[in-house]
């Protein structure tokens, strides 16, 4: 994958799911760059995003993604991506100020300390379904 172009979608938005697609950090860079470009032009009507079961996206990839997500995104899936606390902290910080309603991040390698932080955040945000 060298380039990804996201085109304007009308209506309620679209889902972007590439589960178990063998993606790595380089491809995550392409995806996040495309999202940033589309958002800059007001054309990123993304409602659901999942890169679950792509263990090569690494924590730097997660860092790029959380910077590229549009404000209207409602669902996030990063299940079984072999993510550790560094990526988890990035997700946590994003969740604190986002309007996400469903987040599925189970099957990663988060410490018990970070898991407790996620559980407290889930209690503070009753509109958030958080699967850890």
Task: Label each PLM-derived region with a short phrase.
Residues 1-132:
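Leucine-rich tandem repeat or coiled-coil scaffolds
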